Amino acid sequence: MREILHIQGGQCGNQIGAKFWEVICGEHGVDSTGCYSGVSPQQLERINVYYNEAGGGRYVPRAVLMDLEPGTMESIRAGPFGGIFRPDNFVYGQSGAGNNWAKGHYTEGAELIDSVLDVVRKEAENCDCLQGFQVCHSLGGGTGSGMGTLLISKIREEYPDRMMLTFSVFPSPKVSDTVVEPYNATLSVHQLVENADECMVLDNEALYDICFRTLKLTNPSFGDLNHLISATMSGVTCCLRFPGQLNSDLRKLAVNLIPFPRLHFFMVGFAPLTSRGSQQYRALTVPELTQQMWDAKNMMCAADPRHGRYLTASAMFRGKMSTKEVDEQMINVQNKNSSYFVEWIPNNVKSSVCDIPPVGLSMSSTFVGNSTSIQEMFRRVSEQFTAMFRRKAFLHWYTSEGMDEMEFTEAESNMNDLVAEYQQYQDATAEEYDEEEQDGEEEHD
């Protein structure tokens, strides 16, 4: 079966990852000891996408957990699902990366990376037909961003033809955790542009807004934010894990969503939004799901899709519903909001339907969109980067770990190029596109 190997790095990545496994275990009927206690044979049919079957009928997550300090790992081990992971798959150092990308990428992280790769190799060898990797990390800190991108580039070398999907938590515009976030994020994006296939962009502030505005939580905790992220992560991969009428996998998703190889940063959304522990009290309809899913307030990153245009988008519906109704709704959205879709990619919205809804809901939908408005996030980080880099503020923390200023300059210009590319396709029209092609043909004569 098409297995996915899950890797989580750094504090943020490990906390999101731990939540994700709780959600997946719930969907597949696996309890906290790894024993199956589910009700439907469909839960087991493709359970090996995310689990290895060990002796005694236990299911063990295909997960690699890494960090440069033991803290988060220990709290996962002590948590509700701590006993389910393979003990050898916890790989951690003692020193920490101190929010320093260079430590994660070049010094501390580089010392630990081989032991992580050994575990990854062992897990990959256990797979029948490995489909790809999913990495959870944040881009603002040191470990998830520095060591995370180091691992991604090493995996890229070793498994060049496997899909690399990342769930990357961007620094938020208003909620800043550390002052050097813009440096760490820019250096990471520089790597992700080259080495990842698909990046799902998340950001804490947008998640806070959703908790606050939509879920009416007065002071949301990281647990609440991670609950939203894990719902989306589960939605993106449900087609691989359960039977459905219109299935898709990571590669199909990429083929449908990425018109140009560098533009692989996606906005994600989820519907229906419910807070932890509250059940849905009324049945949903496909039109309601569609409406909520496309709503700008529903996006999990701080960019407004109304400020740009969608190059492509994909919607994954879950639950018992009519495929015809789904298709009608999607066409309806495109017709009503045609100005928000580029006209030079016809039929640029793909939908898939999976029969099994998430636990506690009758139906749900996950949205993944490739919108040019995501440049707002890159632009914002880039401006903060430039403001500090111009004065060479905090640079000594990086140069003392052996980094060169040149690398910063390259990362900065790569980020600016990315913003310019998004802008270029946002402004492009179908007529222009035809003219360019004609010019090209004339040159070849």
UniProtKB/Swiss-Prot annotation:
PROSITE patterns, alphabetized: TUBULIN (PS00227), TUBULIN_B_AUTOREG (PS00228)
Entry's localization field: Cytoplasm, Cytoskeleton
PANTHER family reported in the protein's UniProt record: TUBULIN
GO cellular component, one term: cytoplasm
Family statement drawn from the similarity comment of this UniProt entry: Belongs to the tubulin family.
UniProt biased composition (Acidic residues): 429-445
Stored InterPro entries: Beta-tubulin_BS (IPR013838), Beta_tubulin (IPR002453), Tub_FtsZ_C (IPR008280), Tubulin (IPR000217), Tubulin/FtsZ-like_C (IPR037103), Tubulin/FtsZ_2-layer-sand-dom (IPR018316), Tubulin/FtsZ_GTPase_sf (IPR036525), Tubulin_C (IPR023123)
Classification via Pfam families: Tubulin, Tubulin_C
Keywords, comma-separated and alphabetical: Cytoplasm, Cytoskeleton, GTP-binding, Magnesium, Metal-binding, Microtubule, Nucleotide-binding
Role this protein plays: Tubulin is the major constituent of microtubules, a cylinder consisting of laterally associated linear protofilaments composed of alpha- and beta-tubulin heterodimers. Microtubules grow by the addition of GTP-tubulin dimers to the microtubule end, where a stabilizing cap forms. Below the cap, tubulin dimers are in GDP-bound state, owing to GTPase activity of alpha-tubulin.
Chain residues that bind GTP: Q11, E69, S138, G142, T143, G144, N204, N226
Protein name (database record): Tubulin beta-3 chain
Annotated binding of Mg(2+), by residue: E69
Magnesium recorded as keyword: yes
Record text on subunit structure and interactions: Dimer of alpha and beta chains. A typical microtubule is a hollow water-filled tube with an outer diameter of 25 nm and an inner diameter of 15 nM. Alpha-beta heterodimers associate head-to-tail to form protofilaments running lengthwise along the microtubule wall with the beta-tubulin subunit facing the microtubule plus end conferring a structural polarity. Microtubules usually have 13 protofilaments but different protofilament numbers can be found in some organisms and specialized cells.
Segments for region (Disordered): 425-445
Cofactor list: Mg(2+)
GO biological process terms on file: microtubule cytoskeleton organization; mitotic cell cycle
Signal peptide, first to last residue: none
Molecular functions (GO terms): GTP binding; GTPase activity; metal ion binding; structural constituent of cytoskeleton
